[in-house]
Amino acid sequence: DECFSPGTFCGIKPGLCCSARCLSFFCISLEF
């Protein structure tokens, strides 16, 4: 399955972010 890159909207399908966490409906990268 494809995953969303950081900064992508994920409100509809949370938990599908690539190496990121869905916060405030957007994928937020865990590494800064």
UniProtKB/Swiss-Prot annotation:
It comes from the Eukaryota. Coiled coil: none annotated. GO terms for cellular component: extracellular region; host cell presynaptic membrane. Expressed by the venom duct. The modification 4-hydroxyproline is found at residues 6, 14. GO terms for molecular function: sodium channel inhibitor activity; toxin activity. Keywords: Disulfide bond, Hydroxylation, Ion channel impairing toxin, Knottin, Neurotoxin, Presynaptic neurotoxin, Secreted, Toxin, Voltage-gated sodium channel impairing toxin. The keyword Protein transport does not apply. Disulfide bonds join 3-18, 10-22, 17-27. It is found in: Secreted. The presence of a 'disulfide through disulfide knot' structurally defines this protein as a knottin. Belongs to the conotoxin O1 superfamily. Delta-conotoxins bind to site 6 of voltage-gated sodium channels (Nav) and inhibit the inactivation process. This toxin acts on Nav1.2/SCN2A, Nav1.4/SCN4A, Nav1.5/SCN5A (weak activity), Nav1.6/SCN8A (EC(50)=2.5 uM). Negative results: does not show activity on rNav1.3/SCN3A, Nav1.7/SCN9A, rNav1.8/SCN10A, Kv1.1/KCNA1, Kv1.3/KCNA3, Kv1.4/KCNA4, Kv1.5/KCNA5, hKv11.1/KCNH2/ERG1, shaker and DmNav1/para. Found in the dissected venom (DV), but not in the injectable (milked) venom (IV). This is Delta-conotoxin-like CnVIC. It comes from Conus consors (Singed cone).
